[in-house]
Amino acid sequence: MEPAELEHALCGSLFSTQTPSWSSFGGPEHQEMSFLEQGDSTSWPSPAMTTSAEISLGEQRTKVSRWKSQEDVEERELPGLEGGPQSRAAAESTGLEATFPKATPLAQATPLSAVGTPTTERDSLPADCTASASSSSTDDLDQGIEFSAPAAWGDELGLVEERPAQCPSPQVPVLRLGWDDELRKPGAQVYMHFMQEHTCYDAMATSSKLVIFDTMLQIKKAFFALVANGVRAAPLWDSKKQSFVGMLTITDFILVLHRYYRSPLVQIYEIEEHKIETWREIYLQGCFKPLVSISPSDSLFEAVYTLIKNRIHRLPVLDPVSGAVLHILTHKRLLKFLHIFQRTLLPRPSFLYRTIQDLGIGTFRDLAVVLETAPILTALDIFVDRRVSALPVINEAGQVVGLYSRFDVIHLAAQQTYNHLDISVGEALRRRTLCLEGVLSCQPHETLGEVIDRIAREQVHRLVLVDETQHLLGVVSLSDILQALVLSPAGIDALGA
């Protein structure tokens, strides 16, 4: 079947004709969360054996005027996709919201300024909430891998004989840190308190659409469907067990390519005919981990902690009674929610006027990068080994010339070029038919407030930190910012755990 026919068949038989949208505030990410190895949820309701589902929570209600701007700027998963879900106002009063208490254990985290000495175990949590926040070791590639990939998983099956060496990270100057001093100033905990006082329900969309795959679907068709619908992940429905058993994400596609492309025993075109169920059985071999999720009544503070601590990009919000997926929270959505109130209602702490160089927010050492002349296969190796979701592409002089992300990899399926992973990353970027988020940069002298505004406005997952000559200095991600604004004032370092 020709690609065009396949795409038409997918859209006609698997999905509704409405332009789909995937709510992602804050992915990458991310981004990305593949729950292929996560356990069953037998209590979840059946989607009536359909491959797409539209979940609406509550009726459309009149929103207060200050939220009109959010409807105008509501992000889409990809530029150009219209019809994104509307955001639910935090001030919206409904009967359902009244049933969700906002005083949760993690929401009572003590601000750093309230104690005499900074805690040594910076990511320690109350005992009654530690289990919910860290019940799964499911990790994501960058702040959002779906499941952990053992370091020697290719070697143990004799599928990968040798891996190309990773591109060395450029040497960068050590930035002066002034963040600890800022945390002790008056008003430094304003964003922490805001996220503690609002629940996940407040940040949920009033209506959102989820694309659902049956585990009997062929892998190739599933990945084509991700591209056709502009989404990065889809829940998996097992018709035999009558339950959701995980999620399929872009990371799974990367792992398929990474595992079998150089295999002398299996051809890649044979793998694409496998069903999702077969891939799960081969790769996971029965090793399932519990689904990382959150309740609508949990605070946004807990959502931020869970995303960063577990290094995932997508956090399902599950109905506490039925177990149905109500929404998917992401780094982007959480930051957008906070940013809207920051601009209009919340006071601006003094640290927003400090420069990135002063505060040291971001990653500046041991950066994962790829040369523009390196083959795509090298980028896949780095994605898996370094667990990152995007790679700054640099030339021989160390200047940033592009950004290659995990979502770029899925377009290999759309272009049917996944049998040609020896082409260079630079060539792959030039062949890219869809304009993705691209490279947005910032410089050390820019303030934290300017960086947050740019990320929220451009709806990207990260900014590349460069000097005046476009040489790479570091990366400022959504996780870095949410950690600094929300968790650090409580003495919690989820990134460093």
UniProtKB/Swiss-Prot annotation:
AMP 3 binds at residues 313, 363, 368, 389-390, 461, 477-480. AMPK is a heterotrimer of an alpha catalytic subunit (PRKAA1 or PRKAA2), a beta (PRKAB1 or PRKAB2) and a gamma non-catalytic subunits (PRKAG1, PRKAG2 or PRKAG3). Interacts with FNIP1 and FNIP2. Pfam families: CBS (PF00571). This is 5'-AMP-activated protein kinase subunit gamma-3. The lineage of its organism: Eukaryota, Metazoa, Chordata, Craniata, Vertebrata. Phosphorylated by ULK1; leading to negatively regulate AMPK activity and suggesting the existence of a regulatory feedback loop between ULK1 and AMPK. Glycosylated; O-GlcNAcylated by OGT, promoting the AMP-activated protein kinase (AMPK) activity. Changing residue 373 to M: In strain: Limousin. One of its GO terms (biological process) is fatty acid biosynthetic process. It comes from Bos taurus (Bovine). Residues 204-265, 287-345, 363-423, 435-494 form the CBS domain. Residues 16-143 are annotated as: Disordered.
